[in-house]
Amino acid sequence: MDPNMNNLLKWSIENSTSARQAGNSNGTGPAPASRSNLNPEMLSALFGGPSDADLMKAAMEALHSDEVDLENKMIAFDNFEQLIESIDNANNLEPLGLWTPLVELLKHEEAEMRRMAAWCIGTAVQNNEKAQDKLIVFNVLPTLVAMSTSDPAPAARKKAVYAISSGVRNYQPAMDEFVKHLPEGYTSGEKIDAADMEAIDALLDKLRAHPSEVSA
């Protein structure tokens, strides 16, 4: 990671933490010390950018770094998720080479990392046909289906269902791919229309209510 981007990420994390602490103080106690240790290069990066693309790449590097602890990875994930709420940023995931490292995090040993990865995928593909197609291009749906039916962490399963829900609605290719990878018993083999919200809701409710025995 570029040193200035690394320092900027640390600054962002520190100030995110300070903001949370200040919000939790209810106006009592001393305010957190301000952090003004930004060097000129960092200030230039901050006020001349960095671009959203730079921030997205820095967050992903932090998420894959062994030197960043879980708490700060959660902050990086939260920042990343907020960035890709923008359709333009979500569509920039592929040019930036970020889809593959994001999908890899669905198989992370930490349940919170899997949960956040699924959450980010769900955010990226929601009402975004171009991003929905990436679920097929990067073979994401089999992993999301496996998570939704067998992940030992209920919160991770829930976010996997959310990602599936966002990915298949009104996009038939993803809907067909999703159904193809479902375990037996979830459908009767009939084709489900990606525009049929009631049918999709009923199928997703089955996923929520009946995780496989592996997750029991």
Curated annotation (Swiss-Prot):
Residue ranges the record marks as coiled coil: none
Subcellular location per the Swiss-Prot or TrEMBL entry: Cytoplasm
GO biological process, one term: cytoplasm protein quality control by the ubiquitin-proteasome system
A Gene Ontology term for the protein's cellular component: cytosol
Main location: cytoplasm
ARM repeats: 27-68, 87-126, 129-169, 185-216
Disordered: annotated span: 19-38
Gene Ontology MF annotations: adenyl-nucleotide exchange factor activity
InterPro entries: ARM-like (IPR011989), ARM-type_fold (IPR016024), Hsp70_NEF-Inhibitors (IPR050693), Nucleotide_exch_fac_Fes1 (IPR013918)
Keyword field contains Cytoplasm: yes
Family, as annotated: Belongs to the FES1 family.
Record function comment: Functions as a nucleotide exchange factor (NEF) for Hsp70 chaperones which accelerates the release of ADP. Required for fully efficient Hsp70-mediated folding of proteins.
Protein name according to UniProt: Hsp70 nucleotide exchange factor fes1
Primary gene name: fes1
